[in-house]
Amino acid sequence: MNKLIKEKLSVLPDQPGCYLMKDRQNTVIYVGKAKILKNRVRSYFTGSHDAKTQRLVSEIEDFEYIVTSSNIEALILELNLIKKYDPKYNVMLKDDKTYPFIKITNERHPKLIVTRHVKKDKGKYFGPYPNVQAARETKKLLDRLYPLRKCATLPDRVCLYYHLGQCLAPCVYDISEETNKQLVDEIIRFLNGGHQQIKKELTEKMQEAAEQLEFERAKELRDQIAYIDSTMEKQKMTMSDLSDRDVFAYAYDKGWMCVQVFFIRQGKLIERDVSLFPMYQDPEEEFLTFMGQFYSKNNHFLPKEILVPDSVDQEMIEQLLETNVHQPKKGKKKDLLLLAHQNAKIALKEKFSLIERDEERSIGAVKQLGDALNIYMPYRIEAFDNSNIQGADPVSAMVVFQDGKPYKKEYRKYKIKTVTGPDDYASMREVIRRRYTRVLKDELPLPDLILIDGGKGQINAAIDVLENELNLSVPVAGLVKDEKHRTSNLMMGDTLEIVALERNSQAFYLLQRIQDEVHRFAISFHRQLRGKNAFQSILDDVPGIGEKRKKQLLKHFGSVKKMKEATIEDFQEAGIPKQTAELLIEALKK
């Protein structure tokens, strides 16, 4: 805890409000709310915390806060601040997904579509459906029952849907507005929960057709009834009042929360939403934040009723969402809440099993590696590999593994600038010097371990630059390969002795992943650079092709192979004159 934070903690008010945690770059990394700011913010810097909260606190260099007049104001402000800053530790609903609806378009000849975007266009929207498959299945059923127009633009002749009896072909025939209105009214009746009545009417028509010996028509109606049954049976009936409602329940353990949402549409449980995320506040506060975010998403449907557990503030949720919020004590609604809660507990249990397995592969492997090398746990590992072909286009690459996992946004590529010919030792010296000079200059975090994919000469070159030029003391180890170029061992120490590692240990598997990744990254960069240089050299002797047009061609075609397949017209599309294009094609044939 720095001096600035200590001073700010001493003057925090005992009022509700929001707080914004910031890192070294003054970036907001977490937004929270509190009933009493003084108690909440101080709690981060006192006492013990789980690993994820410790990581958050370790990055906090400053904070600010905003006082509000009530808890509900704090909640609303928190939601707005999360939207504004998108902090990396506020992870519960970052995907911002929108749910699909079935839409009847407002056109002379309306059509049915599945869409995720609700617009003020006088179209009629039904939903939401929690996944696109449920929406598409329902639309497919409606397409079979009601022959509305299918084509986006009207063709000049009938299509297959007309021959299947699923379209009235307004492209050819004059379909009255009254006919379209009747079809739309039937679809609306179906989507508003009237499918049982529609099924009854179809059954009566089927029996009537059979009595009149219209067996083909009776079979067609029977198939429609069966299709309604097969589609609607997938949606479990839960309530008898055909209302739309969402059921929320949550469970929490070991610093994690799971929220389950059951979507009830026209009295049916059609799907659920499962969200798992780390907790940084009290469970009730986390749940309120989740609900505020859940319904603040664009186009997210707010039903007429929401069911929530007894443990949350019903009045605050009603103020926040402006809809009916109930906390049922018994009956079918209470059973739904209990079922959602049970599902939340099960999902948490599964999450912990996966976390344990993942931690064994990542943090567990990091611990094993640290023990084997007799160093502090190498949470941050930076690995280097050189790549060239007989000294041509020499490059180097660095990959970063944080907590045993690739941290790709910090990968770096290096073109070798000061070395001529195939000199891996000098190349390694240059890259290590460039990398850690920049680290010192920009005050970036030093790694806990540096891995060199190379022999003793490259490892010693890296150590020499670090210790004798940059005065840095960072553990350096080398990745040893066998005759098949596979990870074999690790060497470290003054004499670079082999470090014994079990071949079936998580530490060994981690080294394999690191070695494969740094090799892949270096090779792909070398191929990219070699291809670009080959591209440039082919164009050097073509009159009319200067640096500007080289870049133009590279951007348009991307490779020599694609250029060789191109025609004069293709080159002209790329902005190359016809005469120059002809010269290019001749040059590419050589």
Curated annotation (Swiss-Prot):
Stretches assigned to the UVR domain: 196-231
InterPro entries to which the protein is assigned, alphabetical: GIY-YIG_endonuc (IPR000305), GIY-YIG_endonuc_sf (IPR035901), GIY-YIG_UvrC_Cho (IPR047296), RuvA_2-like (IPR010994), UVR_dom (IPR001943), UVR_dom_sf (IPR036876), UvrABC_protein_C (IPR050066), UvrC (IPR004791)
Annotated GO biological process: nucleotide-excision repair; SOS response
Stated family: Belongs to the UvrC family.
Localization: Cytoplasm
Record GO cellular component, one term: excinuclease repair complex
HAMAP family reported for this sequence: UvrC (MF_00203)
SMART domains associated with the record: GIYc (SM00465)
UniProt key word DNA damage: yes
Purpose of the protein: The UvrABC repair system catalyzes the recognition and processing of DNA lesions. UvrC both incises the 5' and 3' sides of the lesion. The N-terminal half is responsible for the 3' incision and the C-terminal half is responsible for the 5' incision.
Highest taxon of the lineage: Bacteria
Keyword Cytoplasm found: yes
Lineage: Bacteria, Bacillati, Bacillota, Bacilli, Bacillales
Protein name: UvrABC system protein C
Cross-referenced PROSITE patterns: GIY_YIG, UVR, UVRC
Organism, scientific name: Bacillus pumilus (strain SAFR-032)
Main location: cytoplasm
Domain GIY-YIG: residue ranges: 14-91
